[in-house]
């Protein structure tokens, strides 16, 4: 673990509208990660967070709703990943899911929606998105609407691999 051959795009995002750095994935490599790939991505997210000095990363599995919805794959997989995290199967991490983006990022929203007992809601270090589309929209929104600064890389390679967006600023590309 992780299995060989799984590459994933991991970004570190700094936004004035959030109280700390966020590590997010996958913005550009895996269009629709399957469950095993999500396990690997969690490993990459936690590894990146640890490189930033976070001992026990808090990871939010993003879905359309914070309720477990049996017909929504990101919802059921988020719940399963959270249970695996509780049992230590994903390493020294705290995983919660499913969490809608607003619940994940804002404690007040979590309280308003009566999401109780979450160590992640309102304070995640990492966001695991269900697919490339949602992650990419967040990535671009963070840079353009929140004036965020981003550093991005491909994890799972044998040598360091930085991957920038064509629309990134010169500063971000450096």
Regions found by a protein language model. Give the residues of each.
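Anion-binding alpha/beta catalytic cores of soluble intermediary-metabolism enzymes, centered on
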Residues: 1-120, 125-129, 134-174
């Amino acid at each position: 673990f992780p299995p060989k051959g799984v590459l994933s795009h991991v970004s570190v995002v700094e936004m004035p509208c959030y109280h700390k750095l966020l590590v997010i994935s996958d913005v550009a490599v895996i269009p629709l990660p399957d469950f095993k790939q999500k396990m690997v991505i969690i490993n990459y997210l936690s590894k990146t967070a640890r490189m930033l000095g976070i001992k026990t990363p808090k990871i939010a599995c993003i879905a359309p709703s914070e309720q477990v919805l049996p017909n929504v794959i990101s919802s059921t997989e988020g719940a399963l990943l959270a249970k695996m995290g509780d049992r230590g199967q994903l390493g020294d991490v705290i995983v919660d899911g499913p969490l809608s983006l607003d619940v994940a990022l804002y404690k007040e929203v979590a309280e308003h929606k009566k999401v109780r007992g979450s160590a992640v809601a309102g304070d995640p270090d990492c966001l695991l998105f269900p697919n490339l589309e949602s992650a990419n929209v967040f990535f671009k929104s963070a840079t353009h609407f929140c004036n965020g600064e981003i550093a991005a890389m491909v994890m799972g390679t044998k040598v360091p691999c930085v991957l920038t967006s064509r629309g990134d600023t010169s500063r971000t590309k450096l």
